[in-house]
Amino acid sequence: DVFAEEKEGIPADQLVDHKIAVVGITAAVNPGVGIKDISKENLIKVFTGKITNWKDVGGKDQKIVLVNRPDASGTRAVFNKFGLDGATPAEGITEDSSNTVKKIVNETAGAVGYLALSYFTDDKVNPLSIDGVEPTDENVQSGKFPIWAYEHSYTKGEPSGATKEFLDYLMSDDVQNTLLKDQGYLPVTKMQVERDAKGNQTNK
């Protein structure tokens, strides 16, 4: 979920980055909170504890319950960087897995967490649009929806032999358009934008 350059102790200058897939992420709320869209400004206020009741963002009169992933989570790193613009979330419930986050948000009145888009397969939790932009595959691929990240494979130097063959296989149409989607990822080959390690986004 993160670039090698973002992790301390990794010799990123010796590695070659192969971006093989994309994951979109958005805030997930308990269906009872009563909202489907939130501004990024208010999303940041919710997760930093400056807004503590859903009625303040057009929802029900319910206390907001934050559900976070651990500090080491790639999903958390991506959500904090692109959803919260680098702000540090307030303390809340911390769960190790996305499946558990979904379960807790579903079972807890007023709860909000964050999940990859592939977890929104039923009505147990609701995905939030941000500033009116829905968290769809198409909006991630066009760059309209802001919270997404690459899945990386790194090699020490340029790949060769079986390693290169495997990476070529991962970039093939069969994998990009079928296998990745089955696993809940978006094909990197369909992205209309790209990002660098600093988070700068440009059109391809």
Map each language-model feature to its residues.
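Exported/periplasmic ABC-transporter solute-binding proteins
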Residues: 1-204
